[in-house]
Regions:
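Short, low-hydrophobicity acidic/polar segments
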Residues: 20-185, 200-201, 205-224, 231, ...
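Hydrophilic extracytoplasmic domains
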Residues: 262, 270-351
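Sec-dependent N-terminal signal peptides
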Residues: 7-10
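C-terminal motif of bacterial Sec signal peptides marking the signal peptidase cleavage site
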Residues: 14-17
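Short aromatic-acidic-glycine turn motif
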Residues: 182-194
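Positively charged n-region of N-terminal signal peptides that target proteins for export
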Residues: 1-4
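Extended serine/threonine-enriched, polar tracts that run as long, contiguous segments within proteins
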Residues: 214-285
Length: 351
């Protein structure tokens, strides 16, 4: 049997049984296969690294021709085992494809004539464990036997990267983690409209590492080895430290786990009783769109942001840093006056 393949990356999903309406008929020619490509905006899942996709097909009678079938990359096409064949009457099949599998996404996928949803999807709290979620829809019939069905996958999440820099040579900043604070964390995706419906649930997303990054004048990535965050598209509502220092309203912010000293070694933040590192934060209110990558560059050259809003109010009298307060005051500056010379008198000295 002649097989064809396509290009995309998908996680494994078991093949469900295929239900075929008798009036549709079966074409015993070439098996159904796909050619896949990805949009170019996000980087985690690409045309080059996509090797499996999960596909559901719906026939002209609104019956599931097959459900959650796994198609695997084979040279230029993606094909399934067992193979599925085109309806012999030339009627169309509607395809709904996605990657990775629902089991990897940690949510429930239902695709049929009336419902086409990924329900209660939540990105992993650990950024290093998050997945890029891609989908594609297409229609095809037996005229696609030779060329395969072209699928163009699009990224359905927003990609977030955090960088930082410090151009102030008077201070040393060392970083061991980042946090994306309080975005909405759960939603349902509609494969038909390609839209999200979000809940009110919020959470924090975290990436930490043992090897500290020392900031310099050029921006450096802070996401660690696990890559960038993949989060739900949404309009963020910013944390407002001026009126809500402890962030009771769960406004959005970025936080960096830092150790701050002067270049001569004087400790600035945190105090010794807290530990070597603690979090500093800044509010954000971006409108995250699906398929868009957002790069935040935090510039510590002129300040260190606010104390972590989720830090408990300190009971240690040696810890002056309360949630939402500025880490540093205004730049140190001086007014300088040079006094006039006074006449000390003249003396004649005999040698």
């Amino acid at each position: 049997m002649k097989q064809k393949l396509f290009f995309i990356a998908v996680a494994a999903m078991g093949i469900a049984s295929c239900s075929q309406d008798e009036s549709t008929g079966i074409n015993n020619g070439n098996a159904i296969d796909f050619r896949a490509a990805l949009g170019t905006r996000a980087v985690e899942t690409t045309t080059a690294n996509l090797d499996k996709i999960v596909v559901t097909a719906i026939d002209k009678n609104d019956a599931n021709y097959f459900t959650d079938a796994e198609f695997t990359k084979n040279d230029a096409f993606f094909t399934s085992t067992p193979a599925y064949y085109w309806p012999g009457d030339g009627s169309d099949l509607s395809f709904y494809a996605y990657s990775p599998a629902a089991s990897d996404l940690g949510a429930t996928v239902t695709i049929n004539s009336t419902t086409k949803t990924l329900v209660d999807f939540s990105p992993k709290a650990n950024i290093q464990e998050q997945k890029d979620f891609v989908t594609a829809n297409a229609t095809g019939n037996k005229t696609n036997e030779t060329a395969g069905v072209a699928l163009t996958f699009e990224h359905r999440l927003s990609q977030i990267e955090i960088k930082a820099k410090n151009g102030n040579e008077g201070y040393v900043y060392k970083v061991t983690g980042v946090r994306i604070g309080q975005p909405v964390s759960k939603g349902t995706f509609d494969f038909g409209t390609s839209g999200w419906t979000l809940t009110q649930d919020k959470t924090n997303y975290l990436a930490e590492y043992d090897q500290a990054i020392t900031l310099g004048a050029d921006a450096q990535g802070l996401m660690g080895d696990g890559g960038n965050a993949m989060l739900l598209p949404q309009q963020l509502v910013a944390w407002t430290p001026d009126t809500d220092m402890p962030n009771a309203n769960k406004g959005a912010y970025l936080a960096v786990k830092v150790n701050i000293t002067t270049k001569d070694g004087a400790r600035i933040y945190p105090v010794t009783s807290v530990g070597e590192y603690d979090w500093v934060a800044v509010a954000i209110d971006t409108d995250w769109q699906p398929g868009q990558k957002y790069v935040y560059t935090l510039d510590f050259s002129t300040g260190a942001g606010k104390v972590d809003p989720e830090k408990p109010t300190p009971s240690d009298p040696t810890d002056p840093f309360k949630p939402g307060e500025d880490i540093q005051g205004s730049p140190i500056k001086f007014t300088v006056t040079v006094t006039d010379w006074t006449d000390g008198g003249a003396q004649d000295i005999t040698m």
